[in-house]
Amino acid sequence: MIEGLDGSGKTTVTKLLAERFTEYDLPCYRTFEPTNGAIGTLIRSILSGKEERFTNAAMAHLFAADRIEHIHNEIVPHLMYNTVVCDRYYYSNMAYQSFDDESLESVVQYNKDAMKLCKPDFTFFIDVTPEECMKRIEKRGESKSIYETEAELKIRYAQFMAAIKLMKETDNIINVGSNSMSPKEIVNQMWEHITK
């Protein structure tokens, strides 16, 4: 699973990592969250500002529900024959729908079923600063999600760090990347961990 702030390069790195598996004739399925299912589509509408914004707790439940559907409908069936590489998973839920230790613990609880059903072998956090992520988002020139402001990215980065600290004893989460690393260099760093 690939995690990181908006603008960190997650989507590009996810694509390149899936291609790396294919280069080595290793079957790979690439996916993402929120999904294109009914719940994921609602989430995307909210994030784009097309739908009214829900409370953080309601959003956390929506993401967790979308994840359960994703696990049952896509991830588990593909794991039978493939490596699955996913752009976002439950760490994003923890980072984006929490604002302190108490709310982080709540989001962890909402994701307990997902954690039981499908715990990743590796979770990679692409560690790019909020300031650099914001520069990249601005450079894209696309419309921004509700989380794509520098102030919001700083909060989300702090929550990612809190989630990683909380889960490091039970999850195999690895920080990779930096502001100056290219997506290919980040994939090379990930590949070293995967092939150990």
Label the model's feature ranges.
Residues 91-158:
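A glycine- and Lys/Arg-enriched "phosphate-lid" helix/loop adjacent to the NTP-binding pocket
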Residues 20, 26-109, 114:
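ATP-dependent small-molecule kinase phosphotransfer cores
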Residues 18, 131-196:
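NTP-dependent small-molecule kinase module
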Residues 31, 85, 122-124, 174-176:
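Hydrophobic/aromatic beta-strand patches that form the interior of the parallel beta-sheet core
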Residues 5:
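P-loop (Walker A) phosphate-binding loop of NTP-binding proteins
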Residues 2:
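Hydrophobic anchor at the beta1->P-loop junction of P-loop NTPases
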Residues 13:
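Hydrophobic positions on the alpha1 helix immediately C-terminal to the Walker A/P-loop
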Residues 10:
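Conserved lysine of the Walker
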